[in-house]
Amino acid sequence: MAGSQLKELKATLKAHGLTGQTNVKKSKKGKREAKKYDHEEKARTIAKIRDRFNPFEVKTTKNKRKGGDPGLLNSDRVAVGKPGISKQIGEEARRRAFEAKKLMKKRKGGVIDKRFGERDKTLTEEEKMLERFTRERQAGSQRKKNLFNLEDDDEDGPIELDMFGNKLTHLGESLSLADDLNVQAEDTEDLEEGQPQRKKTKLEVMKEIIAKSKFHKQERQAAQRKLEDNIDELDEDFDDVMAELMTTQTLKQDDIEVPAEEKDYDIKVKELNLEKRAAPADRTKTEEELQKEAEERRQKLEEQRLNRMQGMLEDEEGEERGVEDLDDGFWGSDSEVEEGENIANSDEDIEVESSSEEAISYKSKKLVAISCPQTHPEFLNDLKGLSLLEQPIHVKAIIKAYQPKLAEGNKVKLANFSKVLLKHMIYLANQRYDKDLIKFDKTQNEFLIILKRLSEKYNQAISEVSREYILDIQERFKKQNFHALNNGDILFFIIVGVLFSTSDQYHLVVTPAQIILCEFLEQIRFKSLKRIAVGSVLLRIILQYQRLSKRYIPETVYFLQKALLSLVVNPDDIESDMTLPIRLDTFDCGLKLKEPSLPDDAVVHLHELFTKSTTNEEDLKINVLSNLFEDLEKLIGSHWNNEAAFPEICEIFEPILSVYKVRYPSITTVESIEEKIKRMKKLNKHYPLALQAHRPTAIPSYAPKFEENFNPAKKSYDTDVARNEVNKMKAQLKKERKFVMKELRKDTKFEARQRIDEKKKEAEAYHSKMSNIINTINTEEGAEKNKYEREKRLRAGKK
């Protein structure tokens, strides 16, 4: 039979040297032995012994490492936790959370609206407002009634009144404690007569202070009311008093004699006041300094243009920004507009020479007033009676009369007028001006100069109207294709190239305009000579846009190839074996002359493109062909020469040039273009495309890997990393959800136990209270019963 737990505990403690005989005599000469256990080791040993004798309070697991204390039972197991203590800690935490939640119950959740009728759905808004107003006035009148009541000594509370306003009494005596207090006060006053004056209490002092403050406040309000009455009386008599003052004769200034010295002094003081304050004058700069500043300014502007061409912008702080960072600052700030104030009133730009015949005829006409038209119909109405050459003079007069510094709002008017001027130039281009071609050119050039000056100041307004017009052109082109274009559209694209910076990588007006020009070159079917002529004009405009940036435009290559082939191919070539690289829209535009000669100054006039002109068709072909060869030579010499694909681009035109050379040897431009291509190819460094050079990497070789404890149920061997991570996250989420649900169940059970305990305590308190009441009643009834019995016995004994 095993021994008791106490004997085992004593034996274990003695075996570890924790108990036993401690009064063993030691030799004095011998050295003191070191303690067998230090404090930490002793504490660990005691903890192990305690855990051994309380096996159900410690959660253990098998020790993977061999070795243990042979003196202890189950020393090969390791403690991993104490469920009892953990449970106790969790219970304490839940109890604290429950108490905090119970304290905050009914203490949060917003504001309770106690206004009258707020929760009554039967009342309208007017009824609620009326009732609230009535109650507020009643409360205010009650406060004002007792505000200055100096005889009101009832500080303790209101007097009890019945429904008729009478004081409540019982058997003729008042229920208020004030009467009893007054009686007691009278008795104390009688007793205190003849005694020295006592010190006032704090309550009496405060009552006196309140009474005095009420009295003084009433006095101040009375004085204020009296002052306001006097002011009102003076206001009523103000007109009469001023009338009396105006009738009095004042002494004239001329009648007063002022000495000459004082007059001179006053004049001198006024001159000094009107004179500008002295300021240090700028030093006169030499011609070298002025040239240097101008050169620095030009270099700075060129640097800014190059940055915009590369797609980089700089803000005021010098930080570079990309095209995507454009904001409202792109238009220019108000300060920049104010700096350009002198553009509108520049004499050299707006004033007309007196010797001009148009200016003299314009001044001779009687104009009542110059208005600043805000729409194009208004402007056309103002131009009635004016010749074509007088219109620019009228425009200059409008700009001079509506300078921004002359009146407020002129800046907005001139901004709108700049839009009207652009529309008017397009309107004039769409009119028939064959007979007045020289006057038309002169007028449009003057308008363009004026619009250029206005665009420097009103850039945003002109940009907005330009973008709107580009959208209008695009919509018309979608519906009617080539028939939607007119002279005004061509002139508009020319004006855009003059007004705005065409070298920018992205521009709010130039970029959309160039996109739609390329769309024209690609989508228009060039099935007639006039269409090819229009395309050559559009090509010249695109080259003008790219004169500085020199970007490669694929649509120009496509149009040049198609136009040159259309002008060299004849209907007879259809039956031959001639192969064409692209599909042509017509075969009727080829040159019919055997030895054509290209002029040096070939010009294609706009008025000949969209009207039935009498120009010879062969002359128009020669002019168009001359322009095309000139554009091709310019592209090869200045635009495409820096491209890495220069040989591939020129391969498109080499067979076409060879055909022209064979059929029309009189065209010497072809030979010069071929020589230029050969020379450019020699200078061009063409490197084929290649991948980036990397160091060769060795193919990794892996030895086969074997696992002794292979178990796919415990470890995932999926080669897909993404799916493996997803499964891992799902498992972790499942584990966390399970843990949270477990904690929620524990919290719910704990709260249920706490509520049951509270209900039990309430029930016990209630029952104990009721039992106490019943016991008290029974005790009193029993005492009264005994008393009654005694009295009954006494009465019976007397009988």
UniProtKB/Swiss-Prot annotation:
GO biological process, one term: endonucleolytic cleavage to generate mature 5'-end of SSU-rRNA from (SSU-rRNA, 5.8S rRNA, LSU-rRNA)
Location of the protein in the cell: Nucleus, Nucleolus
GO CC, any one term: small-subunit processome
Keyword field contains Transmembrane helix: no
A single GO molecular function term of this UniProt record: snoRNA binding
Keywords: Nucleus, Ribosome biogenesis, rRNA processing
Residue spans of biased composition, Basic and acidic residues class: 782-799
Region: Disordered, residue numbers: 13-41, 56-78, 133-158, 277-304, 777-799
Compositional bias per record (Basic residues), positions renumbered to this chain: 25-34
Assembly, per entry: Component of the ribosomal small subunit (SSU) processome.
Family in the record: Belongs to the NOP14 family.
Function: Involved in nucleolar processing of pre-18S ribosomal RNA. Has a role in the nuclear export of 40S pre-ribosomal subunit to the cytoplasm.
Protein's name in the database: Probable nucleolar complex protein 14
Gene behind the chain: NOP14
